[in-house]
Amino acid sequence: MYLLIDVGNSRIKWLYGNKVPSTIEAVSYKQDWQMKLIRAWHLLPEPEAIALSSVNKAEITTTIEEIVRQLWHKTVKIFVSQKQTNHTLTVVYQKPEKLGSDRYLAMLGARSLCHDPLCVVGCGTAITLDAVDGDGRHLGGFILPGMRLAENALLQNTQKLVPMRWTPHLLGNDTASCISAGIHHALPAGVDHIIDELEGQCGYYFKRFAFGGDAQILFGNRPTYRIEPDLIFGGMFAHLSPPKQV
């Protein structure tokens, strides 16, 4: 069994198992997350291996490594984006280690599900998109503010507090619902537009995957998108798998 850990911007998620889907647990940084990890992991049988992806501060990774050492006297494998992985994915970045490990693992996870050209959309603090062709070549990507960042940008100079209400309606009828409608519809529409343009340039269609905490809100009602909440963990398993023979 593996213990796989995803250190995000707002919470830590982990999976104990040998495949996806499996039960995924999480703790917010607003809680006493160190103690919760110790209490939860103390109940687990010793994992065969422990691996971690992080987009947060190095101090959090260091704390988790210390917890793992205390519990099992094991080291933690830290995922870093690579130029080539198991004959499955080739990253376009000149310095692949600069690519966020969450984006890298999400592409690997999608490639484990589909070998067609694909786009992977991350829906968290930021909206990220990465495109991969049918041969596993990473074509590049983009990053936009996520829902909460967009909301904060609109409200930061507002004198009064505006309680947000997420709405499926195209138009709002007060300030809160107008902001909600704008963000809710503009973000996925912008992503759609970029993918449509990319398809026109490349001359073929891309399968569309979405993952992250806001994936269902933003893309759940769009039938062209496949919502895969466990995509990063799927990428971890793909990375840890033995290389395929070619």
From Swiss-Prot:
Pathway(s) it belongs to: Cofactor biosynthesis; coenzyme A biosynthesis; CoA from (R)-pantothenate: step 1/5
Record flagged with keyword Cytoplasm: yes
GO molecular function, one term: pantothenate kinase activity
Pfam families named in the record: Pan_kinase
SUPFAM superfamilies noted in UniProt: Actin-like ATPase domain
A cellular component term, taken from the record's GO annotations: cytoplasm
InterPro entries: ATPase_NBD, Type_III_PanK
EC nos: 2.7.1.33
Highest taxon listed in the record's lineage: Bacteria
Catalytic activity entry: (R)-pantothenate + ATP = (R)-4'-phosphopantothenate + ADP + H(+)
Name of the featured protein: Type III pantothenate kinase
Family of the protein in this entry: Belongs to the type III pantothenate kinase family.
Required co-factors: NH4(+); K(+)
GO annotation (BP), single: coenzyme A biosynthetic process
Residues holding substrate: Y93, G100, S101, D102, R103, T175
